[in-house]
Amino acid sequence: MKMKKIVVMSDSHGYHQMINRVKELEPDGDYYVHCGDSEAETYMMQDWLCVKGNNDWYSDFPNQIKFKVEDLNFLVAHGHRFGYMDRETSMIYTLQEANCDVLLSGHTHVPMYKEVDGYTLINPGSTTLPR
């Protein structure tokens, strides 16, 4: 069985050409996930699982999305919902409440991959405004 490919981006902040560019660079993705602050219209994100970020003022994207790939339950949420103090604890708690294994989030513009107590935290950073 072929392993599923999940393509994740975040915080493109209105650079809409980047959304298409990512798909061009990764045409064989099984899932395309945007972790918020796309600042895109809904129609632009048709093929994406996309959540609302703190700069997506006019979007009707959901605050969170859950999806399952093989035996893993994923939660997508923009990182501003986790605060700044005890951020990691808040992320783990949110995963536990949602009965998920992996959190895909954005907001900080800083890439991160961390495994904590059996949970996985992933932030792809920003495709256009990295820090």
Indicate where each model-derived feature is located.
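Helix-adjacent hinge/juxtasegments
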Residues: V51-N54, Y58-N99
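Core catalytic region of metal-dependent phosphoesterases/phosphodiesterases
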Residues: K2-D71
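Active-site-proximal beta-strand elements of phosphoester/diester hydrolases
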Residues: K5-D11, N73-H80, T120-G125
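Catalytic metal-binding/acid-base residues of hydrolase active sites
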Residues: H13, E39, N54-D56, H80-F82, ...
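Conserved beta-sheet core of the metallophosphoesterase superfamily
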Residues: L49-V51, M85-R131
